[in-house]
């Protein structure tokens, strides 16, 4: 059976989560929510990158999560690579990545990833993954293998990893990352603690904060980063409380963006946050001590990650 036959998406994926999705009236998108389509050279680069990814049997979160910035990022020659397959063991109802039973790890993926990054001549890459609760280390060793192979092939390339929470395997995962820590360690809190059972079934807010703090304690020179979505029913004050928690756990880089509903089978958008409010989040974050804060309607965790890393002194 091929992966598409076993991959659940939308309503099929979220049908068995503990807190059921309650349909809401679809809000009209405001004028500041605009998806940019590439043209000319950007369109050509977009097609080149897609062809290269298929040739090397690689996945990107840009495609699998239906990111609205895919045309802009591919058009500029950047991509966020998603390792360990395209099937996730979690059923998060905000995310468009498919759920199901994953395939065994591809032992050649680290080399194939490194070859692709080298061929694309990328100065900065983001490597992320699906959740792999089926693996004893949550996939930590595969991350490290990808980091090592990429550095061997492209010594000047800076590497950011966007990792899952390694539920129940955190101590093992942290020890493995000691072998080859990334240049930036990113783990997204996604939302406020009140909404965790609804938005992140299987995850734990305090556990995610612990991951970020303990990694930083082991690697004080490696910046830590986290991201949030708005529009799921949180309040501005709750977002600011999360920012304080992140700073209390030594997180230095931040992204906040507008949640956009991938399908009617996903959590509805309950509010569109005005750009002025995003600016307020950014101002408050910098006042709290974040080295860099990217806050805006179309911001995603790895959107312009290279520029954010540059602002934090990584590149």
Swiss-Prot record:
Class of enzymatic activity (EC top level): transferase
Reactions catalysed according to its record: [[Fe-S] cluster scaffold protein carrying a second [4Fe-4S](2+) cluster] + N(6)-octanoyl-L-lysyl-[protein] + 2 oxidized [2Fe-2S]-[ferredoxin] + 2 S-adenosyl-L-methionine + 4 H(+) = [[Fe-S] cluster scaffold protein] + N(6)-[(R)-dihydrolipoyl]-L-lysyl-[protein] + 4 Fe(3+) + 2 hydrogen sulfide + 2 5'-deoxyadenosine + 2 L-methionine + 2 reduced [2Fe-2S]-[ferredoxin]
GO cellular component, one term: cytoplasm
Binding residue positions for [4Fe-4S] cluster 2: 88, 92, 95
Subcellular location: Cytoplasm
Cofactor: binding comment: Binds 2 [4Fe-4S] clusters per subunit. One cluster is coordinated with 3 cysteines and an exchangeable S-adenosyl-L-methionine.
Enzyme Commission code: 2.8.1.8
Record keyword Cytoplasm present: yes
Stretches assigned to the Radical SAM core domain: 74-291
Key word Transferase present: yes
Domain of life assignment: Bacteria
Pathway: Protein modification; protein lipoylation via endogenous pathway; protein N(6)-(lipoyl)lysine from octanoyl-[acyl-carrier-protein]: step 2/2
Homology family: Belongs to the radical SAM superfamily. Lipoyl synthase family.
NCBIfam families per UniProt: lipA, PRK05481.1, PRK12928.1
Protein name (Swiss-Prot/TrEMBL): Lipoyl synthase
Organism of this sequence: Aromatoleum aromaticum (strain DSM 19018 / LMG 30748 / EbN1) (Azoarcus sp. (strain EbN1))
Taxon lineage: Bacteria, Pseudomonadati, Pseudomonadota, Betaproteobacteria, Rhodocyclales
């Amino acid at each position: 059976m091929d992966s598409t036959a076993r991959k659940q998406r939308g309503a099929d994926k979220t049908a068995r989560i503990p807190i059921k999705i309650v349909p809401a009236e679809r809000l009209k998108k405001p004028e500041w929510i605009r998806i940019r389509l590439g043209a000319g050279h950007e369109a050509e680069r977009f097609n080149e990158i897609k062809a290269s990814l298929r040739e090397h049997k690689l996945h990107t979160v840009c495609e699998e999560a239906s990111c609205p910035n895919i045309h802009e990022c591919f058009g500029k020659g950047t991509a966020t690579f998603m390792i360990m397959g395209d099937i996730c063991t979690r059923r998060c109802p905000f995310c468009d990545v498919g759920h199901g039973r994953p395939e065994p790890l591809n032992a050649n993926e680290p080399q194939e990833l490194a070859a692709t990054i080298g061929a694309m001549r990328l100065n900065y890459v983001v490597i992320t993954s699906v959740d792999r609760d089926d693996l004893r280390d949550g996939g930590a060793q595969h991350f490290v293998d990808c980091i090592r192979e990429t550095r061997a092939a492209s010594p000047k390339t800076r590497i950011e990893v966007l990792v899952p929470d390694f539920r129940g395997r955190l101590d093992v995962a942290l020890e493995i990352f000691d072998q080859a820590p990334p240049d930036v360690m990113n783990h997204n809190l996604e939302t406020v603690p009140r909404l965790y059972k609804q938005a992140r079934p299987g995850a734990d807010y305090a556990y995610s904060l612990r991951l970020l703090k303990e990694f930083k304690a082991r690697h004080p020179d490696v910046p830590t980063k986290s991201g949030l979505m708005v529009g799921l029913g949180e309040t501005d004050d709750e977002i600011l409380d999360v920012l304080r928690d992140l700073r209390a756990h030594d997180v230095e880089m931040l992204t906040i963006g507008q949640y956009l509903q991938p399908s009617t089978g996903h959590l509805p958008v309950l509010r569109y946050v005005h750009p002025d409010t995003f600016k307020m989040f950014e101002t408050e974050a910098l006042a709290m001590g974040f080295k860099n804060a990217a806050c805006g309607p179309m911001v995603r965790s790895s959107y312009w990650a290279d520029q954010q890393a540059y602002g934090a002194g990584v590149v």
